[in-house]
A protein has these predicted regions:
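Extended, solvent-exposed functional surface patches
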Residues: 1-136, 142-153, 157-160, 176, ...
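Long, domain-scale non-catalytic interaction/scaffolding regions in large secretory-pathway
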Residues: 135, 140-311
Length: 311
């Protein structure tokens, strides 16, 4: 019998998976370092037997490693830091991860981050897409860049309005990232409402769970897309939207149902499928807990097997 007053309980397997798997490319190393940072901050929620000895040094080591994967144009590459090998999605994801690491108290070198932001700003304003990016994929990746840059006040209401017509092209992951961007930019409340409604229109609800459905072509694998990653990005954005909008929000109990869907997707493995899913899902559970688990629970949990009291 496992009982926990928080959705963050029972996630030991995700940390074990990220701790033990051998990582080689920048995305994997960055995800592992960020997950180690989460481990340090969430230690009271985790089993005492779960030990990650390198967790105290790994986040800083990972940040310092970033320059080895940064191309001259400021973008990030999986292996070789050359302009022609830069991945727009990986670059936007790196900027997001830097934000998460900074929120956890880590310092990000200004030279690396500023070059990265300059690349992303150019990416937003010019046609710098790889040939294999469809227009829909490009719109979704731009949304990730907007979400990352909004944290630093490097985009404004006019930028949001400029990209709003492209929301219809974005997949649900992109829509969730665009919603996250709008929530950080003053004067975009109506746009936030519109995007939230577009996301909610894809919800398929049952009595206890919810799923968000869409069709994608195989090209989205180039930006590491998966249904579960999308669901986790939606949970983060809808939780933030619900918190900000208060009584105006139409979200209802969807975040609660979405948490159930996400946690059950681990099945018997204790973790999700890959680095992207484990990190986005962990972030989503943290974001959910921050909004909906603010109050300390007052409860007593007891269990019986037939008439025998277990505890």
């Amino acid at each position: 019998v496992i009982a926990s007053p928080t959705v963050i309980g029972g996630v030991n397997g995700a940390f074990e998976y990220m701790r033990d798997y051998p990582y080689y490319c920048w995305e994997q190393k960055l995800s592992k370092g960020t997950m180690a940072s989460h481990y340090n901050n969430l230690r009271p929620y985790l089993a005492e037997s779960l030990i990650w000895e390198a967790s105290q040094t790994l986040p800083t080591q990972t940040i310092e490693l970033a320059k080895e994967y940064q191309a001259p144009n400021g973008g990030m590459a999986y292996f070789v830091p050359q302009d022609r090998r830069v991945s727009p999605y990986l670059s936007a994801y790196t900027a997001l991860a830097f934000n998460w690491l900074r929120d956890a108290g880590h310092q990000v070198p200004a030279t690396v981050e500023n070059k990265l932001h300059d690349y992303l700003l150019a990416f937003l304003r010019k046609d710098l897409m790889p040939d294999y990016y469809s227009r829909d994929m490009a719109s979704s990746v731009r949304a990730v860049a907007l979400a990352a840059l909004a944290t630093h006040d490097k985009i404004d209401r006019e930028d949001i309005k400029r990209y709003q017509p492209h929301v219809k092209r974005m997949d649900l992951f992109g829509k969730a990232q665009f919603l996250a961007a709008t929530l950080q930019v003053p004067g975009t409340g109506r746009i936030s409402d519109t995007v939230a409604d577009l996301i909610l229109a894809h919800a398929d609800q049952t009595s206890g769970k919810v799923s968000f459905n869409e069709s994608q072509d195989s090209g989205y694998k180039r930006i590491l897309s998966s249904s579960l990653r999308t669901h986790c990005a939606i949970l983060s954005s809808l939780s933030a939207y619900d918190d900000k909008m208060g009584s105006r929000s139409k979200v209802g109990d969807i975040p609660f149902k979405l948490v159930r869907s996400i946690t059950q997707r681990r099945k018997n493995r204790g973790h999700w499928e890959n680095t992207q899913e484990n990190l986005y899902c962990m972030n989503a559970l943290i974001d959910y807990a921050r909004v909906y688990e603010k109050d300390k629970p007052a409860m007593v949990v007891q269990s019986w097997l037939d008439k025998e009291k277990l505890g």
